[in-house]
């Protein structure tokens, strides 16, 4: 059975599911180059031949349950507790006697219980309401939260994810720049109290925060305080849910879980017998996959499980380029000679992380490497860069915190060596992808050769795009990035071809 699904929120996507597994996943922003954009007509042209006929259904928006379903079906667990934390989900009706007629809130935190094939139950939910809905409660002497039912709490305070969004817009960033705020937290020198009154209602900007955080240092200090407050809240939510249900299989989804610092903090504080799966495509770009998978299991009743193997789900790209024939060893030597090399393979990664199919690579040993790559991409100089390390060497170079692996770059880990300064953030940490040969054989072979030459089994890895643009989807996108920057080469390992930039020449 084939199922095609689409999500037209921000981060719009289309997904084609064949027999329960993702066949194609197209992210609108990669097609129209509008960051976090909604669906566009061009997105659908990739699916025309797959859906010549069939039944079209519009399913009511149940935003958080689609997040939860996505993480559950990718986890491989038979049953699980699914925790969803994001900016905001769908609208929920709230009415008298507590609220005005016609009032609505939005889901911000949800906890579901999932079991195969498609049995699910809402266990807990937090709903954010606009300030003006709360007149009745405010008249009773203050408002911070109300348990309308045992499993639902209504509040006027933003979710942890939207706190980041609101802080970003209040200091002049885009709402989706939470990653920058997380990077700034490491430069903090002082503690600043996070006042929840600054996060009341739906408005994505706080005038009070704008006034309070006028300098870069104040913004860094606040970022750290916000990071600490949010990760503590999420950790407590997960621990309480485990305690109340007794379930120790935990799936995490929603855009908040792109916060690698928080993920590591939560991991360190969970009991060792708890099994955790973080959905790598946990933002709204994964909604169409969650919808399709939930619908497939509802229609088929299948109990077959498909644990996630990788997220290279983009449209297969034809690679017809002219260049120099090379081996992985040749390219590894260029990396060792401190050339900046893009790597492009047929199918792009789903989600925001570049995992070796749409990456810019560099020698992590260069003490000026971070500044060089940030300048090349047009990024702020305070932002860290990630690394990909061969799985079998990871524990020698990073404090793995008892993690078996980190294949989707969802954890921030302490760097154990001074030999790789280019990947070290100011706090001596790095966002890490551990790589097995079975996950991406061409990428693995390149790093293996780099290790053979240098004795360092890892490379600096950042996404194949420049600041303000989206990650390259097509060969044309990648060539534009190559020739519009100070990159040296673009490597197509499936073809064994290396293309020099117009500046580098042959």
Predicted regions and their residues:
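Short, hydrophobic/aromatic-rich segments at coil-to-beta transitions
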Residues: 1-3
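Flexible beta->alpha loop and helix N-cap segments adjacent to enzyme active/binding sites
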Residues: 5-37, 65-194, 258-259, 263-506
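N-terminal phosphate-binding loop and adjacent alpha-helix
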Residues: 30-53
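Stable alpha-helical structural segments in soluble proteins, enriched in small hydrophobic residues
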Residues: 43-50, 68-71, 237, 241, ...
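Short glycine-rich phosphate-binding loop at a beta-alpha junction
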Residues: 45-60, 246-255, 342
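Active-site cores of enzymes that catalyze phosphoryl transfer or operate on phosphate-rich substrates
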Residues: 180-229
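Secondary-structure capping and boundary motifs in well-ordered enzyme cores
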Residues: 218-219, 226, 230, 254, ...
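Phosphate/ATP-binding catalytic cores across multiple sugar-kinase/actin-like superfamilies
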Residues: 224-250
């Amino acid at each position: 059975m084939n199922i095609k699904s689409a999500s037209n929120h921000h981060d719009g996507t289309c997904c084609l599911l064949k027999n329960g597994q993702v066949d194609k996943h197209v992210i609108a922003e990669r097609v129209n180059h509008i960051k976090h954009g909604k669906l566009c007509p061009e997105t659908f042209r990739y699916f025309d031949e797959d859906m010549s006929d069939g039944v079209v259904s519009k399913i009511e928006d149940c935003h958080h349950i689609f997040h939860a379903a996505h993480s559950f079906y990718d986890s491989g667990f038979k049953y699980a507790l699914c925790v969803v934390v994001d900016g905001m989900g769908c609208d929920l009706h709230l009415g008298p006697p507590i609220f005005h007629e016609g009032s609505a809130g939005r889901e911000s935190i949800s906890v579901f219980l999932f079991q195969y094939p498609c049995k699910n139950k809402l266990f807990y939910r937090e709903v954010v309401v606009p300030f003006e809905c709360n007149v009745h409660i405010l008249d009773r002497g203050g408002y911070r939260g109300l348990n309308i039912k045992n499993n639902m709490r209504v509040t006027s305070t933003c979710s942890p994810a939207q706190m980041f969004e609101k802080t970003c817009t209040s200091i002049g960033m885009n709402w989706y720049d939470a990653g920058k705020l997380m990077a700034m937290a490491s430069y903090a020198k002082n503690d600043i109290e996070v006042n929840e009154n600054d996060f009341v209602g739906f408005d994505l900007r706080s005038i009070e925060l704008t006034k309070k955080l006028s300098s870069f240092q104040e913004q860094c200090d606040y970022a750290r305080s916000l990071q600490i407050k949010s990760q503590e809240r999420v950790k407590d939510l997960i621990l309480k849910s485990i305690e109340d249900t007794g379930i120790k299989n935990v799936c995490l989804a929603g855009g908040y879980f792109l916060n690698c610092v928080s993920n590591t903090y939560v991991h360190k504080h969970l009991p060792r017998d708890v099994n955790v799966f973080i959905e790598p495509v946990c933002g709204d770009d994964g909604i169409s996959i969650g919808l399709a998978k939930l619908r497939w299991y509802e229609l088929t009743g299948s109990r077959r499980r498909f644990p996630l193997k990788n997220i290279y789900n983009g449209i297969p790209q034809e690679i017809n380029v002219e260049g120099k024939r090379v081996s992985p060893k040749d390219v590894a030597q260029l990396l060792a000679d401190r050339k900046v090399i893009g790597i492009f393979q047929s199918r792009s990664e789903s989600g925001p992380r570049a995992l070796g199919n749409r990456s810019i690579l560099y020698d992590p040993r260069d003490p000026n490497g971070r500044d060089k790559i940030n300048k090349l991409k047009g990024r702020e100089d305070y932002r860290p860069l990630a690394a990909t390390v061969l799985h079998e060497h990871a524990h020698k170079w990073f404090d793995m915190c008892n993690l078996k692996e980190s294949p989707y770059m969802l954890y921030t880990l302490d760097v154990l060596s001074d030999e790789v300064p280019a990947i070290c953030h100011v706090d001596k940490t790095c966002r890490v992808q551990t790589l097995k040969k079975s996950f991406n054989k061409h990428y693995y072979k390149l790093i293996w050769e780099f290790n053979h030459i240098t004795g360092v089994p890892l490379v600096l890895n950042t996404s194949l795009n420049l600041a303000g643009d989206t990650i390259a989807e097509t060969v044309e996108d990648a060539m534009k990035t190559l020739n519009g920057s100070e990159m040296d080469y673009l490597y197509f390992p499936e073809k064994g071809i290396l293309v020099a930039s117009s500046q580098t020449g042959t």
